[in-house]
Amino acid sequence: MANLLGYVGRRSAPYVVRRFIGANNYRYYSASQNLKSNLSEPVGEDPIEPTEQASKGNINEVQDGLSKAEMNAEESVPWYLRDDSSSPLLENKNVELPFVPDHAPSSVNTFLELLSNEYGLEDIELFDLTQLDPENEYHADNQPTDYMIICTGKSEKHIYKASNELRTYIKHNYNLIPKIEGMASNSKTPAARRRMLRRARKGPLATDNDYGRTPNSWVMCDTAVNNTCIHILTDSRRDELNLETLWCREEDIEKYSTPESATEESDDIFIGIRRFHTMTPFARRFQQMRSYSASQSNESLESYLHKLTGESLTVDSLRQHIKGFESDFQQPTIKDYNTRFNFYRSIHIQNSDVMSLEKLTSILLDKYSSLQIILSNSIDLSKERTQDMVDFMKLLIDSPEIKKHFDLSNSKQMNSYSDELYDKLAQFVSSLFQFSKEQIDMSRHPEFLPLLWRLSFVQKNDTVIGSRMIDDIIYQEGDLPDLPGQPSIFQAKNRARDTLDLINYYNQKIDENASTTNSFKELLLFTYGNAGDWAKFWNTWEISFNLLNNSKIDSKSSIKNWVRLVVYLAIRNDRSAIVHFLNNYWNHSTSIAGSFIDDFELNNNVFNSDEEKRSFKNSVYKMLNSMNNDNESNPSFSNVKEFVDNLD
């Protein structure tokens, strides 16, 4: 019936009928010019008579006569031949478009107008990821998207139609095939129809519930045009996901964040019927006795946690705090369980004899034994499991109980220590996903991969060069520290290799859309340098930052990478690495990775900012000063000094 109405609306139905049935593609039906001219003449009157009256000065009477004639003519015309006029009850809703920065490509503004004016989407938001903090995981340098557009559709059908039209538009106007996810047609294949008929004979399944995650409720379109990505969601799905908090600036988080609230009260007699139908009698009685709210937090529990912060307490004091905490741990929410873990974690760090790692691991898993948490639709258990894995890896790194069983000054003991960390993580993950069919989403949490890699090495001293130190020196005008030039970490090479193999397998087999970010690549680079493994350091530099990225990054990004490399080498203060850089990567390199001078010329012989130029000059001077007299007489090094001296 719907197809038939659509066909009629496109072929011959009048405008009012077409608008009622929702036909989008149609051709206006209008009367011929001759018919309109004939119908506009007064019937039964001499057309010259109004002119004669006008000559006598009766202008008002002429106007009244003309208006009456027009009304009579309009009433005599069939309704489907009258001129089109929109109903006064239908108001055109003007959608306010977001501000488009001046540096954004014109295609961004084109997409915004297309989504609003042509497709009728609402609540359009634009996020410029190039303006985020460089340390932000979603900065344009850390992932392949520069601009995110979020908008809301009226229904799943509306979103499907808009997504289909958007794909067609990009295909015909940009000669590109966009990548669209979440878009599904409502049409059923013959095999699906037969399967549904077999199900119908057996009766409906009580578990056939998508819980709001229906097809076309969230459609993502990677336009492949100027690194622009478009998300179209239903209003309820958009409120649930709250994607805006991922890509907004830090100062705008409060604007988009929505407070977690308890289940809304409703007078609807059908609310919760589907969920109630699938519950066991015990679960129904349990829910009637205690209502669950994910946002409730027992303030007294948090007060116990604050008492442990920054204090070194005796064993008796710790046990008194534990007794008071457990007495207030009544009808716990998901937040209370997390507070409980952080409370006992602080005790474990202070005194592992009072709270062992085994007990603390059980406390972290206790929340999954709570029936009200498992049955709650307001809690994303997949997200909770990912966060628990992150918290457990942090616990393994800081736990004093594991470290006291190994002599970390011995290389063999360090390897055994790293093996122990990975073994405990594997046991925890096995328990965490024991009764779940989910797979681990390694790309969901920005800290997951860095922490997984962090388990592969042990710090030898307190000063380890990382991305944050490099940022402080470049952008905060920090001073270059004087380090001894010795390795600051020990890396378990076998475990590091296994970790990289696991990440590559996940990106190739599990989630083909996942890719390592530039921040994680820089973490790998600095780890090899801090461990003194310079062969892998330079190999990672060529593959991750130059060789494979020559066709993907512009000259500005190349200069940024060179500046960060020079600052790192100056801080690391390893003479062999400095000599290798000056001989092989400074000018006219024979390596496929290129050289700094080549990329500097491609960038019109300028740095991206004064901060980069200042930090680059100071770092090169520090490297040259660390060389002995023989190396200073090297003509290639004198050319380096001359280049730096001539920088404005």
Curated annotation (Swiss-Prot):
Keywords in alphabetical order, please: Membrane, Mitochondrion, Mitochondrion inner membrane, Transit peptide
Q: Which GO terms describe its cellular component?
A: mitochondrial inner membrane
Q: Give the UniProt subcellular location, in the record's own words.
A: Mitochondrion inner membrane
Q: What is its main location?
A: mitochondrion
Transit peptide location:
1-29
GO annotations under biological process? mitochondrial gene expression; mRNA stabilization
* Role this protein plays: Probable mitochondrial mRNA stabilization factor.
Q: Which family does it belong to?
A: Belongs to the ATP25 family.
Q: What is this protein called?
A: ATPase synthesis protein 25, mitochondrial
Organism of this sequence: Debaryomyces hansenii (strain ATCC 36239 / CBS 767 / BCRC 21394 / JCM 1990 / NBRC 0083 / IGC 2968)
Taxonomy, top ranks, is:
Eukaryota, Fungi, Dikarya, Ascomycota, Saccharomycotina
Chain's gene name:
ATP25
